Amino acid sequence: MKNWIGIFVFALAGLTSTQVAGKPNILLIMADDMGYECVTANGGESYSTPNLDRLARGGMRFEHCYSQPICTPSRVQLMTGIYNQRNYIRFGLLDPAVTTFGHLAKRAGYATCIGGKWQLENGLKGPNHFGFDEYCLWQVTRRP
């Protein structure tokens, strides 16, 4: 796959079953610039994706969706669950007043973590403000 390092991965997971009694771990993956046909579990033959195939076999698959043609608005939409025409303030801004899936997971008793490309300009409001306990991200602030 072209530049797997550039794949954007959101990960949200509960730490242990004792901390989140009876609740499943949640792993959400959003890949930047990756087509449906790039995963062998979807019938693709151009790449070998055994780990993604294993996750697809053992988890819930989200196969019918719409996305923006560029990555930053897609991330804002995924974080908020709100279509871009309703949550848009300006390009790449995640509104500090909005509730994200990180907030919702924390309210449900999950420990939260996010990894990958952030690139959501929001001044002094970083991932912790948006409901994430831990993070390993690049492009946390916008380049000048």
Briefly describe each language-model feature range:
Residues K2-I5, L15-P144:
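Formylglycine-dependent sulfatase
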Residues F10-G14:
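Hydrophobic alpha-helical targeting segments used for export or membrane insertion
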